[in-house]
UniProtKB/Swiss-Prot annotation:
Originating gene: rplV
Biological function: This protein binds specifically to 23S rRNA; its binding is stimulated by other ribosomal proteins, e.g. L4, L17, and L20. It is important during the early stages of 50S assembly. It makes multiple contacts with different domains of the 23S rRNA in the assembled 50S subunit and ribosome. The globular domain of the protein is located near the polypeptide exit tunnel on the outside of the subunit, while an extended beta-hairpin is found that lines the wall of the exit tunnel in the center of the 70S ribosome.
Protein name according to UniProt: Large ribosomal subunit protein uL22
Alphabetical UniProt keywords: Ribonucleoprotein, Ribosomal protein, RNA-binding, rRNA-binding
Lineage summary: Bacteria, Pseudomonadati, Pseudomonadota, Gammaproteobacteria, Legionellales
Any single GO BP term: translation
Amino acid sequence: MEVTAKLKGAPLSAQKGRLVADMIRNMNVSGALDVLKFTPKKGAKLMLKLLESAIANAENNNGADIDDLKVGMVCVDEATTLKRISPRAKGRANRICKRTCHITIKVSDEE
């Protein structure tokens, strides 16, 4: 059985999110939780909360045993970019792109 949790519009660039996603892909759930707790990145905190949500979904909706769960797919895709303007000298302006991403985590109890 495969259980999914999604976070849409996370305030994180997809490139930085993929660095964290690569660390926990194909790990068992308890190991992935430990890695995320001690990783000093903004994306780790977001993925920790999302992984805990996926574990709760598997436990409550499907009655899965937490010890058997593994992190299957971790997908970080680009979402909309918020465009902001920063004033510069002589009436000019620079564009600031605040990037967001969609994060999807699938946990499963199958090998």
